[in-house]
Amino acid sequence: MKNNVKNLIEFIDHSPSCFHVIENARKQFLEHGFMELKEKEYWDLEEGKSYFVTRNGSSIIAFHLPKKDFQGFHIVASHSDSPTYRIKEQPEMSVEKHYTKLNIERYGGMIPETWFDRPLSVAGRIIIEENGQIKDQLVNVDRDLMIIPNLAIHMSRSSNESKQLNPQKDLLPLCGGNLTKDGFEEMIAKESGVEKEDILSYDLFLYNRMRGTTLGINEEFVAAPKLDDLECAYSSIEGMLNAKLSKDYVTVCAVFDNEEVGSGTKQGAGSTFFPEVLKRISYLCGKNEEEYYMAVADSFMLSADNAHAVHPNYQDKTDPTNRPYINEGIVLKYNASQKYTTDANSAALVKYLCKKEKIKCQVFFNRSDMLGGSTLGNILTGQVSIKAADIGLPQLSMHSTYETAGCKDLDDMITLMESFYELGKEVQI
């Protein structure tokens, strides 16, 4: 198993919730000398230093300041969340005094059938009271805890036909026998090393316990949960940590929460988090408002979110002339309805970098008779008017609880990120 793929699998394995994604990113940045900033405190920025700031524990913006008289910003944006199920308050539901299942609700647009008949567990954060203080604490029940059992075909002869699943009835996970009321919270408290009475609230989500792996005759594929979009988040972090960062531009690695539900939260791409950080950097470097706008005009962003590869069993679902394949390079994403930010100018820079690094570049369009998904690029450029391109890695089974992508593509994406972060003012965008 190649190093990048091995490290990606480790990153995903240790990131069972969006909060864990950001905590793992935070640890990596700290290990590489980045300094943590707090939004509610004064910032003191020095030339040649690197920093990061988090919001809600589920979004992070890291940046390197080469000099105070910088040209603009070079940004890579991705997201920390994936489709899953959120556990409701008072979740225990007794079934005929013999089973206990949990009350959950959908988060994002998942493929529900992929959650059946596999070991699941729960992770996220709890909010506790400790010595008169309110604190948050990450929790991961690191064992096979529950399952969503299918109905046997003998009891549903039409189960292989199209079926509409009811998330309030058909998708509730079995977590035990006849548990006492509050048994779930008692278990969470025990796993977290706190008293149940100290838990004030929680944000807890289901996750697939299947570990990532490589497969294929030549181990050319990587399969894992949450490849959308942790593959791009991981690549952007690695690219920033590995690159000889630009001496002209502030390089920015941003990972936002809540992309899968529209980004309209205080920590999402549609919030003030992104423009506020860029403005604080600019103003603390002595730029006035006009100079901030000048810096924005000389900036560029890569919105990094995975793309649909041609499916081997459903080839007709892809555009007839623009057909991305796994392990055939970075994907540039276009959409006439402007769900993606790519235009001729921004695509040219991506193609230039791919040519420079000898990386293949592919193109994605939706079929003209099919609606596609959206991502965070156009939401961010609606907040700050930055030239941008939407890119991603080709993958299969997007929004399944277990997805498939290419090993070579991961290497190429990290190389592209490094090259982008190293760009100086010699290349006019």
Model regions and ranges:
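N-terminal hydrophobic/helix-forming segments and targeting peptides
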Residues: M1-I429
